[in-house]
Amino acid sequence: MYEKIFPNKRFKITMAFLQKHISKSESILDLGVENPFSKMMKTDGFEVRNTLGEDLDIDFSTLKNEKFEVVTAFEIFEHLLNPFTILNEIKADKILISVPLRLWFSEAYQSKTDPRDRHFHEFEDWQLDWLLEKTGWEIIDRIQFTNPVKKLGIRPLLRLFTPRYYLVYAVRK
């Protein structure tokens, strides 16, 4: 599921955003199984626990039964059928979310080898903002950034200047 070449630009921007808003003394629940970025957070001194691969559309008991100060969800919500329920169930006071933005020149992502690795939602920034607002979160900071790929073609050229990722820090109202 994870590439052998890590998305360094995306990871650097995400780590800087995390460091800007979250103290290393705060407990973090990172939605999704342990991954290269959650390992980077731990190496950087953050106290991180990941979910165990349960289907969060069906089993969100970790969110209901345990209290963390921060929940992070890096490229998770686009895979969920109902992110509204998850956002409602989170007991933390802070959340950091990143989602890939819907690109007008690219179809929704669907892995050809892993049936779990597909995007049910392709967000525009206003859609995630609205979802957060409706579930009781107040956005404090947000950024969009590009993630160019080193390939030839029209889509790689468009990715040089078209924002690809949306990163949001919000607090519970």
Task: Give residue ranges: language-model regions.
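Conserved N-terminal segment of class I S-adenosyl-L-methionine
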Residues: 1-70, 84-93, 115-130, 141-173
